């Protein structure tokens, strides 16, 4: 089985030992505490689940700046984005060396993790700008990732953490949320050797379904792990429970038995385009995937990134020896009226745009909101029905 990034064994930060978990939970209630941002909570979940292995906690400022500039920490370890825990104020934990991190997304703000504080540092505006430029390719405050990053405060607390729970992800999505540890175990149970991972933050239509099948066929994979983001997105995106239902329906009806796993992970989307694509590859290797699909404008938003920047970054900026996972580079896929099947558009040079069935996201939302199913060549009818029911449930503007 493919090894985790940077180590022979996965190093999740969740406290699995029941006695230790009980002791730590009791201790945490009496520790100085802070409510962290939603993004930091998601990162704590990812650390706990083993996705960010071998990192053991939140970065100090020097490591965060180094990661932003070179995708390596000051000790040379590879990690493609800064992992900061930013606060508006650290007054509540002043002088403390051990603190509790509380969850902003669960009622009552329960303790999510315990941190051994190694540094409390102020981040300057210039340092924030440097990180946003390097990671997001822009400092534009309208970029949703930049806006979120800049809204979290300027005090960075760092240090290793011990994670006590997986926030709302495990309770709200018990059939879908999986840790990297659990996915590795299931891959071994199934006897899969070659595994394709597919990232999605949206429902999957015919083009996505066929892309997974194309990738599996091309690399002779035993199965595909459809790995959906369960955390916060930008306003207007389809909520996770609806995406979950639509994707599960598609997988159950249209993939051969024992060739697909539908899973999810707890993380707030960065919309960091190429840098986020590298992070996605990083933690897909940690969960046991040997191949990862990266398509056009992967993890992008608006017009901030070129259509294939998320692919070329692996040639231009990622050292060849840090990731063992292989990238399956995809173009847009669409149904060809000429050929009667879904194809990658780059593989049909004799086609004109009119030869494909393509619908914009806006047009699809309009159709679904009006109770009109997209063509079956675009969307499976069972998937379309789930989405139509969701759009009809929304307040009419």
From Swiss-Prot:
<dbReference type="GO" id="GO:0004781">
    <property type="term" value="F:sulfate adenylyltransferase (ATP) activity"/>
</dbReference>
<dbReference type="GO" id="GO:0070814">
    <property type="term" value="P:hydrogen sulfide biosynthetic process"/>
</dbReference>
<protein>
    <recommendedName>
        <fullName>Sulfate adenylyltransferase</fullName>
        <ecNumber>2.7.7.4</ecNumber>
    </recommendedName>
</protein>
<dbReference type="Pfam" id="PF01747">
    <property type="entry name" value="ATP-sulfurylase"/>
</dbReference>
<dbReference type="InterPro" id="IPR014729">
    <property type="entry name" value="Rossmann-like_a/b/a_fold"/>
</dbReference>
<dbReference type="InterPro" id="IPR020792">
    <property type="entry name" value="SO4_adenylyltransferase_pro"/>
</dbReference>
<keyword id="KW-0548">Nucleotidyltransferase</keyword>
<dbReference type="InterPro" id="IPR024951">
    <property type="entry name" value="Sulfurylase_cat_dom"/>
</dbReference>
<dbReference type="InterPro" id="IPR002650">
    <property type="entry name" value="Sulphate_adenylyltransferase"/>
</dbReference>
<keyword id="KW-0067">ATP-binding</keyword>
<dbReference type="InterPro" id="IPR015947">
    <property type="entry name" value="PUA-like_sf"/>
</dbReference>
<dbReference type="Pfam" id="PF14306">
    <property type="entry name" value="PUA_2"/>
</dbReference>
<keyword id="KW-0808">Transferase</keyword>
<keyword id="KW-0547">Nucleotide-binding</keyword>
<dbReference type="InterPro" id="IPR025980">
    <property type="entry name" value="ATP-Sase_PUA-like_dom"/>
</dbReference>
<dbReference type="GO" id="GO:0000103">
    <property type="term" value="P:sulfate assimilation"/>
</dbReference>
<comment type="similarity">
    <text>Belongs to the sulfate adenylyltransferase family.</text>
</comment>
<comment type="pathway">
    <text>Sulfur metabolism; hydrogen sulfide biosynthesis; sulfite from sulfate: step 1/3.</text>
</comment>
<dbReference type="GO" id="GO:0005524">
    <property type="term" value="F:ATP binding"/>
</dbReference>
